Amino acid sequence: MSILAEQVPEMEVYSIDEAFLNLEGIRDIQSLGTDIINKVIRGTGIPVSLGIAPTQTLAKVANKFAKKYPAYNRLCIIDTEEKRTKALQLTEIGDIWGIGHRQVAKLEKQGVKTAYDFTELPESWVRKNMTVVGERTWKELQGISCIDMETTPPAKKQICTSRSFGKMVEDIDTMSEAIATHASTCAKKLRQQKSYAMSLMAFIHTNNFRKDSPQYWRNTVIHLPIPTNDTLEIVHYALAGLKTIFMQGYQYKKTGVIITEITDSTQLGLFDSVDREKRERLQQTIDKINGKHSRLVKLAIQGTGRNWKLKQKQLSGHYTTDINQIISINCTCLLYTSDAADDT
């Protein structure tokens, strides 16, 4: 994503592997597109496909063509009415970004099979039968831009961190390590988006696919005294919640923490005895250290062994980001000089 951000004045990260780039004011988009593709491959080794069009929805259509047809060389540009019409005629209605399964069924009853058929429907019908989102998609396919760039990702309204265990867990000590780690991660995410939590949920459950084992599923919701993103507090209350729901005698498969009632501000409680300024300075220092040295500083309750961690035997290699996984190649080099060549 950093390589993409360097090429354009404005970028919206849409997902972990997808982004929208604002190319307004750029004349030679063909050259820029080719340059971006080459730079990403050189910098990461990852092939990337680009779809360029007047709107985000049309850009998604173009991107599908760039991925699907080798003749495009990973770059498809919809910059004329003829190209737009042809692309929509070749795109099934179910492949359009923003059109759900229920809407597809409704449109098919109207004889709509392709994206082009959809654009031929009267705008009044679309507005009446497909809500504001459907009308926006209809306009975007017409080439009318209706979706603004979100250069700053919206803050999450709920944060969940959970993980299945690598093996069944029966003791509360191991469960506490996992819960503390999940709660710590949630607190970190809160601080990253400058938010505060007003409540949290801790949950545990067994493996419901193991019919030969007794089943147990419980959760508890805890309302925090004041909105907070402090790791010590969130871990404390998550562990308190675990103690109320943990039951001995079961083999647990998964546990997690969900942060809810997220707000962008906090306020001190009347009887709050915690030195908030001191704790905030401590948290900032820990975040700064962990930013430079990943997860170097953590709470003792989180443990060090991580015996509960999910098994990850089939992970892809991190050849470009982990120095210990850099591929080494053994080869033999044959050298000769001009003098040696003359002697022969």
Where are these regions (language model features)?
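Conserved small/polar residues in nucleotide/adenosyl-binding loops
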Residues: 336-344
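DNA-contacting surface of Y-family translesion DNA polymerases
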Residues: 105-249, 331
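Short, hydrophobic beta-strand segments
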Residues: 19-24, 219-225, 266-272
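A short, charged helix-loop
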Residues: 73-90
